[in-house]
């Protein structure tokens, strides 16, 4: 809900409970003074609500899931100090051309701004065979296809995640059940490789990925709940905190505080 909606809701509720109108409360004021009064009250309430939301957003939400410390906060994933999870498709494609990979996606920003050599990255992806999951298989196009949830370490600060399928129409996609299975695999893989270092994860599935269920796509709140739920069911254990990093827009569309009563 926007700040304006909150203000109108508050004013409407108060006047309804009190059983008065603004005009009735100030019968001696001219209409112009009443308008000024309403604008001042509106501005003050809007400012208070925005300050409250800003403080709440910066503070984040702290949870414990199976004893694991988990934080949900707004931030820039790339500025976080620790392992940063970057979603790729199942082939670990690295071509940023706004067709295979969008320049504006986390995947695209990572490759263009944080990869020194694509040849080195591609070589690492092909040669790093350490995984608790199934080994990669050769697809019809001859490329290696990795199980969803597979992680590849890069530069000691990035965890590259095989997150989605990729079809001939250059669409990243998966079903909701595959999404859940991918997350369970992710948490178990993170537990294997994190080495006691904090891990930062974006809100997976909130970008360009398509869900195969016809006519339906999960809300950001659904995705957030699913990430927490799969962490719980994975039985993975961490000594360092797991942080789910949201954009400001995603934070506005979710209610992380609701998760405290849901866990």
Residue ranges and their predicted role:
Residues 1-263:
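Macrodomain-like recognition of ADP-ribose-binding/processing modules
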């Amino acid at each position: 809900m926007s700040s304006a909606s909150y203000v109108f809701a508050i004013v409407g509720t108060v006047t309804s409970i009190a059983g008065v109108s603004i005009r009735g409360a100030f019968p001696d004021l001219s209409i112009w003074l009443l308008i000024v009064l309403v604008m001042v009250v509106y501005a003050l309430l809007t400012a208070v609500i925005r300050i409250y939301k800003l403080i709440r957003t910066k503070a984040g939400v702290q949870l414990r899931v199976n004893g694991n410390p988990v934080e949900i906060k707004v931030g820039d994933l790339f500025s976080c100090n620790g392992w940063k999870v970057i979603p790729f498709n199942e082939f670990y494609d690295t071509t940023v051309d706004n067709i295979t990979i969008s320049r504006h996606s986390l995947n695209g920003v990572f490759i263009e701004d944080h990869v020194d050599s694509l040849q080195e990255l591609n070589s690492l992806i092909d040669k790093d065979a350490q995984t608790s999951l199934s080994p990669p298989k050769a697809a019809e196009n001859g490329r290696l296809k990795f199980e969803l949830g597979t992680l590849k370490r890069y530069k000691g600060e990035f965890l590259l995640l095989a997150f989605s399928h990729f079809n001939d129409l250059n669409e990243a996609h998966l079903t909701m059940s595959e999404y859940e299975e991918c997350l369970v695999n992710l948490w178990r893989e993170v537990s294997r490789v994190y080495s006691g270092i904090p891990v930062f994860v974006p809100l997976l599935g909130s970008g360009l990925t398509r869900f195969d269920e016809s006519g339906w796509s999960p809300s950001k709140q659904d995705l957030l709940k699913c990430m927490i739920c799969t962490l719980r069911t994975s039985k993975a254990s961490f000594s360092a905190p797991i942080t789910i990093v949201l954009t400001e827009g995603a934070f506005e569309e979710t209610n992380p505080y609701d998760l405290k009563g849901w866990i």
